[in-house]
Amino acid sequence: GIVNTNTKVTIDGKTFLHRVYGGGFGDPFSTGNNETGKIGGNTEVYIQGANIYGDVFGGGAGVAPKDINGTYTYFTNVAKVSGTTKVEISGEAKIYGNVYGGGDIANIKSYITLTGSAKEAYYNTKPKSESKLDQTTGKFLSYEAKDYTTFVNITGGDIFGEVFGGGKGLMKADAPDYQKVGRINGNTLV
């Protein structure tokens, strides 16, 4: 199916033996590009006190390109997130895998070609993050992030893998145009 708006996943105190996704799950039996598992808005994943024995993704689970009679089909819209993704690891969370701001061979936003002033404005807009602390006690007061496409925020927990602002893509040997899936069409903030 398709979610037209936003998704939010919160895990606190449970054990998962598989991967966690903020986005949708693509149909692995697809033979043509479609919108199965597409999220029309933003995704948020909050892991506060869980044991996760797998990878964590802000985006969805896409479908690898298929060679059908000598022609590759790329599933660029399958499990795509149209908005932004946010992954936050905090508290006593234990992640026994990798953390990705993006998806698993699934795109975040659409690829567009910019020219002129639109291109200049895009490249001049950088992701920003700001923590506010009490100047007297050093106590954490608030945190704000903006102008990002994918955002990974780690305020606690233990991660026994790697952390990526982007997604998990393909190797060059997997398909001639391997770069078409697993893209972050924007910027990342970790």
Features from the language model and the residues they span:
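Surface-exposed loop/turn motifs in large extracellular/passenger domains
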Residues: 1-19, 24-55, 61-190
